[in-house]
Amino acid sequence: MTSHASPASPSRVRLDFLDVVRFAAMVFMVQGHTLDALVRADQLDVTAFPWNLWHALRGLTAPMFLLLSGAVGCLVLGRGADGRVPARRLLHRAGWGLKLLALGYLLVFPANRLADLRWLSPDVWRGFLQVGILQLNGLLLLVLTGLAALTRSDRAYAAWALGLGAALVLATPFVARVDCFACLPEALAAFLSPAHGSLFPLFPHGAYLLLGVGIGQALKGRSRDEALDRFLDICDFGGAAALGLSALLARGLPPIHDATGLGLAFTFSRLGFALLLMGLVARRAPAFAGAVAPLGRRSLAVYVGHLLLLYGLPWIHGVAQARYRSMSLAEGFATVALVGGLTFGGVAVMDLIQRRAAPLNALLRLSTAALLAWALVF
């Protein structure tokens, strides 16, 4: 081992409490998307209690996912004796980044066929190119893959990621003043600014994933119990520090209201509450790890599955297309149970097929890819 390589660490331990936290975030995400898409506004008024609290908590799911994605990505990053990440692993990560980008755009594909894209109006193109959480994840995975290739230790990798994350947070108010769409193509500007409807622009949302890399580095190489203790310390002290900084910047107590979502005080407030909520769930993780941790590892499948059920694709109608914000609260909760059951149940079945029927799993994947290609072309 060279002097630049990370110290040898024990064999990798699965930190199941991270999977439990991710599962909790998924449950809240599914019910949040479902109720928001289907329940009438007069029965779900996010300006009045208790739905204003529910709406604020919904805003924490994305930071939680991004923080956990960064942490897990760091935990599974392996290096050779010379400190380098093997080329095959780098290519695999880059491939995943491109797949996430493609999947993010596919879920909002605005035409029946690729050939029909030429007929789209500028407004439809603008909606199609809005950046969601999958596009943000894909871009940052490509960035972190490049960073992993350039660094020679996990410590350096995490330090650069933390530095970039801090830079994104601090630069957000300045980037918000720039008309990115006047000087960049729509597809690129949408990654930088929410002005045309992007829900997860790089500034500041990318910072959560990059800061998560630092969490992963703090847990790496530790036993499960040691890692859990360290994680709880990070969530408690980091959350309190972020909320304190938010209060200083806003000259008032969090939660901070910010209609744009781009202010420093709001970003630190959201980070602080997300960390505290993650710590709260992690404390209860040992009681539920055996039951829910396996599903927590399939966050991408759950995300895609419930969106398909709700919103469909150009060739498949979802529930929201027929009942958009027209249900009662009781009907909405019943649909939450249905969508959640089908999503998590479907993921569990697919996991079972993958483990016990590899040929069938390969056939299903190939068939899905072939049907998708046929739909896009013909």
Please state what every model-predicted region is:
Residues 2-378:
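Alpha-helical transmembrane segments and their immediate juxtamembrane cytosolic regions
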